[in-house]
């Protein structure tokens, strides 16, 4: 289905970020870098940048696919720590059909719960 293809497209890109994160973890614990604090700091910086890039990719994916049932799923799964106001912007951008879907409703409930917890 169209949604399955969108999810596969998203997962393909995210898996590259995950692989890169694993590479950084492996490099961080490589014996030849363990005693080199400059190298360790550089690896940590690259690792943090990779996390930010994945997060930004996820946000962009959601914002650029408001007509996909995958968008609210990705928002709940990967950008749940986003500011509630931004999640609200994401939700309002969804098409009515997507907003009324299982994950659209779950996203709305999550936002409402977060707002009431503030």
Feature locations, PLM:
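Short amphipathic alpha-helical coiled-coil/interface segments
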Residues: 40-58, 91, 111
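Charged heptad-repeat coiled-coil "stalk" segments of single-pass membrane proteins
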Residues: 4-11, 52, 66-67, 74
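Sec/Tat-exported extracytoplasmic proteins
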Residues: 14, 18-21, 25-28, 54, ...
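Short helix-to-loop capping/linker segments positioned immediately adjacent to catalytic or ligand/cofactor-binding
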Residues: 29-31, 58-63
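A non-transmembrane, solvent-exposed segment enriched in polar/low-complexity residues
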Residues: 1-46
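Charged, long alpha-helical assembly modules
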Residues: 56, 63-118
């Amino acid at each position: 289905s169209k949604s399955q293809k969108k999810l596969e497209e998203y997962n393909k890109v995210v898996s590259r970020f995950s692989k890169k994160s694993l590479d950084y973890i492996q490099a961080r614990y490589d014996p030849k870098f363990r005693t080199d604090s400059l190298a360790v700091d550089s690896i940590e910086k690259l690792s943090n940048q990779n996390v930010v890039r994945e997060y930004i990719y996820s946000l962009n994916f959601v914002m650029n696919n408001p007509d996909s049932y995958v968008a609210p799923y990705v928002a709940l799964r990967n950008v749940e720590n986003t500011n509630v106001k931004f999640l609200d912007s994401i939700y309002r951008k969804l098409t009515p059909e997507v907003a009324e879907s299982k994950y659209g409703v779950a996203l709305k409930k999550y936002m409402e719960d977060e707002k009431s917890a503030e």
